[in-house]
Every structure is written in C-alpha cells, then in structure tokens.
Amino acid sequence: MESLRELYKIGVGPSSSHTMGPQKAAFKIKETYQDANHYEVYLHGSLALTGKGHLTDKIIEEVLGKENVEIHFVSEELPKHPNGMIFKVYQDDKLLDSITVYSIGGGALLYDDDNLQ
C-alpha cells in the first residue's frame, strides 16, 4: 500500500504525470550524467500534445538549464505508455546515451533501462 506521502504530492503544473514525472526524470538524468552539457528531449504522445499547457517543457528546462536543452514534441506514442520521453545526453558533440522513460502518474517513472530505476 502506498504511503500518504506517495499519494498526496505537491508539484508544479496541473498534472503530475506531465510535470512531476518529467522533472524527476530530468533530475535523474542530470545526476547520472554529470559530464553532460547538452540534452535533446523528445516528448511523445500525451506529453507532446499537452506538454506546453501543462508546463512540461518549462520544468525540464528549469532542471537541465534552458540554454542546454532542445525540446521536441512528437505526437506519436512510444510503445509502453502515452507519456513517453527520450532524453539524448551529450558531452559537447558526443552522444553519451539515449534514455527512454515513461511518466506513469503521480510522479512515478518507468525506464526502459533497469539500471536507472
């Protein structure tokens, strides 16, 4: 059973899956790839279609730095969930990694890579 702290969270924006989840994912990416200095983020499905209104792009820019991130809106859903994101992580011009993550509600995340869970 979930604790009350898991059930009731205060976040930015009107939708936890569109702000808390992407914010948490961006923090995890930043923490995991400390040498990165540029990011491309692809918001898929529902995140792409309603992300601007729900401030998804703004919360990611806030975490990764507006000058360091390019955000792309892709209407097609990824296979596992309507709220999919792909983070491409760079150091200078070298691609360090590409991470697929899903914001599944309430700030919870599902990564394609089990090492990031």
Where are these regions (language model features)?
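A generic structural motif
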Residues: 13, 47, 105-107
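Small-residue-enriched alpha-helical segments and adjacent helix-cap loops
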Residues: 24-34
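C-terminal regulatory domains involved in ligand/effector binding and gene-expression control
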Residues: 63, 69-117
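Generic alpha-helical propensity signal that fires on short helical segments
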Residues: 28-30, 57-61, 114-117
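A structural-propensity feature for long, helix-poor, extended segments
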Residues: 38-74, 82
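Electropositive phosphate-/nucleotide-binding environments in soluble metabolic enzymes
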Residues: 19-23, 54, 81
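Conserved phosphate/anionic-ligand binding catalytic regions in large, soluble enzymes, centered on
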Residues: 8-26
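Short, hydrophobic/aliphatic alpha-helical segments
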Residues: 1-11, 37-41
